[in-house]
Amino acid sequence: MRVSFTKMHGLGNDFIMLDARAESLPPMTAATARALADRKTGIGCDQVILLEPSDSADFRMRIFNADGGEVEACGNASRAVALLHGEAANVETSGGVIAIAPASGGARVDMGVPRFDWEAIPLAYAMDTLSLPVGWGELEAPAAVNVGNPHVVFFVDDADAVPLDTMGPGIETDPLFPERINVNIASLTGDDALKLHVWERGVGLTRACGTGACATAIAAMRRGLTGRKVAVTLPGGTLQIEWDADDHIIMTGPAAESFRGTFDWGDYS
């Protein structure tokens, strides 16, 4: 079966977009997602995004990481979907329904309300998620938040100085996090401005992570480090994050189409 795809990215976090809203595709498996995402033998991406019909929203977005695992949310992919769809829409995800819309220079996404209770992260046992009483070497007392998917956020003096490539895997897979965890290292760079590096669950180091930017901004706001509108700069660029009066997280930032093509599904199944 010959299948069309669109390659897109949000601040360098890149996606293979597959649209099954009008015409069904074969079932997506972990093996197929891994094969498509492979940068040497496949098309190559951080996530495979599958758009499907939905009974509860305008359509459904499914997200498969490069390791083949299906995850709940992806902020950068949500902006890419907004650009691809071309108009405002409510989108069903495994993490809940989000609202997307094209915006000047990219897209705007209402990521919904963050969750802070330890069961929602989830953690293996009860802890204060504003400051977990745990540490990994020089990294201590992170905040934890679920913004559709689970994150821990460490605030340090210099985010660039932390060897996240070596520390990330151990934190991601720590038994404290039964569903694994996304790891964020952040430092304040000015009034309502943060620098961020992210080890993404199932992906590794990434140039940008939209949900990571949301989680980090919310953690900074909860700790009184910033106001309720924050600029978060990642290696791939900057996102604007707002925690609005209704406690919804609003993310605004760029997305772009890279190219389009086709592939034979059988080659990747």
UniProtKB/Swiss-Prot annotation:
Primary location group: cytoplasm
Gene Ontology biological-process entries: lysine biosynthetic process via diaminopimelate
Residue numbers binding substrate: 13, 47, 65, 75-76, 149, 182, 200-201, 210-211
Active-site feature positions: 74, 209
Catalytic reaction annotation: (2S,6S)-2,6-diaminopimelate = meso-2,6-diaminopimelate
Described function: Catalyzes the stereoinversion of LL-2,6-diaminopimelate (L,L-DAP) to meso-diaminopimelate (meso-DAP), a precursor of L-lysine and an essential component of the bacterial peptidoglycan.
Protein name: Diaminopimelate epimerase
EC number(s) per entry: 5.1.1.7
GO molecular function: diaminopimelate epimerase activity
Keyword Isomerase: yes
Biochemical pathway: Amino-acid biosynthesis; L-lysine biosynthesis via DAP pathway; DL-2,6-diaminopimelate from LL-2,6-diaminopimelate: step 1/1
Record-annotated site: Could be important to modulate the pK values of the two catalytic cysteine residues: 151, 200
Subunit structure: Homodimer.
Keywords linked to the UniProt accession: Amino-acid biosynthesis, Cytoplasm, Isomerase, Lysine biosynthesis
Pfam families linked to this entry: DAP_epimerase
Enzyme class: isomerase
An annotated GO cellular component: cytosol
Subcellular location: Cytoplasm
Similarity section: Belongs to the diaminopimelate epimerase family.
